Amino acid sequence: MPLPWSLALPLLLSWVAGGFGNAASARHHGLLASARQPGVCHYGTKLACCYGWRRNSKGVCEATCEPGCKFGECVGPNKCRCFPGYTGKTCSQDVNECGMKPRPCQHRCVNTHGSYKCFCLSGHMLMPDATCVNSRTCAMINCQYSCEDTEEGPQCLCPSSGLRLAPNGRDCLDIDECASGKVICPYNRRCVNTFGSYYCKCHIGFELQYISGRYDCIDINECTMDSHTCSHHANCFNTQGSFKCKCKQGYKGNGLRCSAIPENSVKEVLRAPGTIKDRIKKLLAHKNSMKKKAKIKNVTPEPTRTPTPKVNLQPFNYEEIVSRGGNSHGGKKGNEEKMKEGLEDEKREEKALKNDIEERSLRGDVFFPKVNEAGEFGLILVQRKALTSKLEHKDLNISVDCSFNHGICDWKQDREDDFDWNPADRDNAIGFYMAVPALAGHKKDIGRLKLLLPDLQPQSNFCLLFDYRLAGDKVGKLRVFVKNSNNALAWEKTTSEDEKWKTGKIQLYQGTDATKSIIFEAERGKGKTGEIAVDGVLLVSGLCPDSLLSVDD
């Protein structure tokens, strides 16, 4: 049965309302979904892009930036997100990464547009983390010994603390511990430098022995071990670290070579080399020329009395001179050869002496009469036989030869000085003189050589003449002291115009003050070449001449 209209109308209205309600519900649900997207805003019942946003071709709201983001992207209304290396509101400014802290590069940084570049110093290479590592290795620099790779690069090493790196950074140089004074050896030992180290060794003339539970340097007795080089006609005396030689009675020489004094010889003929003989002649000729050029005479005294002889057989007193053997620890064969050679030289010298005496006496050279002719000045000369004589002092020009190798005077080395004077061969290979080499001692060190004149009280004036030489730059000073009650400095020389031998003079005036000795003192300078030398020492009666001729003239 059909429903009545009155009943059907309400049902129709409710159905229509239900249908529209469902559509509105669906439409509301879509708006809510759209409202959750960025840049979507709800305007009443409508959904639209927010301010600063606009719908793109895909129907999605996207932000807008004015005037835009040059090197970046717009992430909000007028809000830019810049790409790395750029900054600013519109991302148009470059970032200087090299000025940032910490610096992005280890060595060198160069800024670029929107980025930067790192560079390494020479000898290094760039790593991915912008650090620099040394590109050189130990195999590339060729060290002398060992090498170590470090952060700064390969480093050459020396195997000992006694070595140091050379300026080239590869080789090792020795450190001289002895010269630097970094080490001090025990008593009686000397420092010997080696490559990379050093050791302490006994001084020459000593040997290492184990005594009383410890090692010590003990003196070698060269005399008992027959390792000395003294002449067969000399006595050997052992000293600490060395030995001394002294000619036996009846012989003369330096102890290493001794020759017999002839029985019939004229007392101590002047045996100086030609330069000294010539100088004596010139000096005497000069003095006699002041006396109306009188001729030089050789006076042969008449025997009248027998004086008490005083024997002084040492032309150079080597009791204070150490004659060091070159091979103190053995080598008898070498020493025997030296002794044999010395003995042959002595025989030849002895024979030459006899012939020379006869020749000189006939030729009229200046010589010493066989008398105690030192009466004028108290000096006793050598006498092997008791002789009688009578002198007329006014007729004598007395000259005493105090040269080192054949003179008649006593010379001694000072024990309290810093170094000894050393014999040095003359240029003509005849005889020797005394010298101080530039390498002897240190700066300001003193070496003294004494000429002994016991009880010299001149009854007339005497002149001391000597040859000297100061060779080398800043080699030192030479002084001469006359030792008496005053010990006065009589002569001094510090420099020389050239390296030639020159002649010095000191006047010994008549008086009551006894002259005990004359001291030649050498003071070392800072020079490393040359020498200080003395030769041809003479005592001549009378006043010193006003002018002297050079030995080299």
UniProtKB/Swiss-Prot annotation:
It comes from the Eukaryota. SMART domains: EGF (SM00181), EGF_CA (SM00179), MAM (SM00137). The keyword Cell membrane does not apply. Residues 65-91, 94-133, 137-173, 174-212, 219-259 form the EGF-like domain. Residues 400-546 form the MAM domain. Residues 301-315 have a biased composition (Polar residues). One of its GO terms (molecular function) is integrin binding. SUPFAM superfamilies: Concanavalin A-like lectins/glucanases, EGF/Laminin, Growth factor receptor domain. Residues 291-350 are annotated as: Disordered. PANTHER family: EPIDERMAL GROWTH FACTOR-LIKE PROTEIN 6 (PTHR24050:SF24), PA14 DOMAIN-CONTAINING PROTEIN (PTHR24050). May bind integrin alpha-8/beta-1 and play a role in hair follicle morphogenesis. Promotes matrix assembly. Belongs to the nephronectin family. This is Epidermal growth factor-like protein 6. It comes from Homo sapiens (Human).
